Amino acid sequence: LTFGECCELYIQDCKARNLRAATISHYRSSYKQIYKYFSPDMPIDELTVNKYNSYVIYLKEHLSNDVSINAYLRDLITTLHYLMDNEYMPTFKMQSIKVDKMVKETYTDAELKLLLKKPNINKCTFIEFEAWVITCLLFSTGIRQHSLIELKVKDIDFDNLILNVRVTKTRKPLLIPLNVSMINILKVF
């Protein structure tokens, strides 16, 4: 088997496990980058720990961001573990690179006040008001963008102050309590 054929086997496994289309698309995109180093025509038994380590060095020389390097390595490691577990190739240890933790820049209090300031309903456009409601809901609940997009009016329980998030990354629905001010914002919206 070639490396490319083995990557396709892993994609088929992802489909069989019913992974999301976005996840499969991510792997395909990652493979395009990995194929710049490992030819898809390379026999899989030629992929050794030495070649893996050479790839790590190649990434360090060609990419400046350690997080990006680890994203490619994580995808490759996951694929290779699948191949090793299914005895398509010999087993060897792999690891991603060590990354320095960066302090994430957060909003200042002034920026938060500006972002969360209620627009004048009589003067703002619907889009401005909608953006403010969405911002408040995201800050209030911490839900993901995709979960927000999939929300329906019926998912808001105004009586019990609960938001039913049906679509989540883990595919497990969530019941999120809403505070009274968020409920009032949603009622106006």
Describe the predicted segments one by one.
Residues 1:
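N-terminal helical hairpins
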Residues 138-160:
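Short, charged phosphate-coordinating catalytic segments
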Residues 71, 77, 130, 143-144, ...:
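Short, cationic motifs built from Arg/Lys/His that form the positively charged side of catalytic pockets
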Residues 76, 134, 148:
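Short, basic/aromatic-rich helical patch in the C-terminal catalytic core of site-specific tyrosine
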